[in-house]
Amino acid sequence: MASSAASPSLSLLSFTSKPPYPSGSQRLFASFRTDGLFAPLTLKSRRGRGIVVKVDDVDADGGGADEYDMDDEEVEEVDNKKDYDVEYDPLAAAIAAAGGGGDGDIAFVQSKSFISTQGWDSDMVVDYRINEDEFHKLSLMDCDFFIRKPPDPDNDVYDFREMYVTPPDTDIYSIPRVLAPMPQKYIRCAMSDYGCYNVTEPPIDAPRDPLYKSEREISKVFLTKHYRNRRTNDPEFVLDLEEIYVIDSKTKSITRARVLVTVPGGRKRDRKDDLLVIRDNGTSFKIIHVGERDDPTTVIEREEWTKTREDMEKHLRKLRDFSVSNWF
């Protein structure tokens, strides 16, 4: 008889905002590439008021300033603000590309099959097929996720305005559930995945089979934005750990992670010392200083101690009868 057991990976992941090592492979954050500029865009203000960004207790904790003004360059970094409509000018983009902008420019390409994914909260099957070569294909355990791929030498530019989801290895395309506002412009992202290894033992009546079979089951994919859209070969390249998009295999949805920032300094801090800690099965995100990193043994011991205390308290709770003994 065959038996199966899932060996989940550690519930804590951490990585710095720098790429762990320079490599051209496509695995995890080793594929961090690129630094580029957005296509020319126009910002239209709906309300004539100044922009002041405040960091509340939920988003940040530390000795940094709680309020600061944004300069013109940082305004371009603000995505999906309700006060603005972002419009692309294809003609201006073509002129900028022809003007010798270099490899850093991301050429704007109008999709003929474009369909907006903003505002959908449930799947909607479309009646056409897409050219999968024009999309980033993210293969998860329960589905395949497609995000439009603008042409770029580094192959890490994402257009979140057009996305599709299908059952694994099928061509039944539907619009995924979008649970948070998505960027309305091209951005560069580094991809990583979160999952576990499923280890299967062979049946007794098949002794010649391998002793076990291990399969990687990806439950979530994380897309982390490159800070200021810089390429990985840029000397100032870092990851913007505050902007992470999470694709969930089970719900076939995409959302933006809520990240807790404990590093002081606000948006103008030195991000090269940021360390992202992911816990609770890929649902909890926190940015700490790289100097506060714990070694894996300490983390495991702390988690086991917490779980042991909870299990013991649950057991002792069954033996207590305060509601009865208080009568005596």
Swiss-Prot record:
Induction annotation: Induced by cytokinin (e.g. trans-zeatin). Probably regulated by HY5 in response to light.
Key word Plastid present: yes
Keyword Transcription regulation: yes
Motif (RNA binding domain): 301-319
Entry's localization field: Plastid, Chloroplast; Plastid, Chloroplast thylakoid; Nucleus; Nucleus, Nucleoplasm
Cellular component annotations (GO), alphabetically ordered: chloroplast; chloroplast nucleoid; chloroplast thylakoid; cytoplasm; nucleoplasm; nucleus; plastid-encoded plastid RNA polymerase complex
Name of the protein in its database record: PLASTID TRANSCRIPTIONALLY ACTIVE protein 6, chloroplastic
Gene from which this protein is expressed: PTAC6
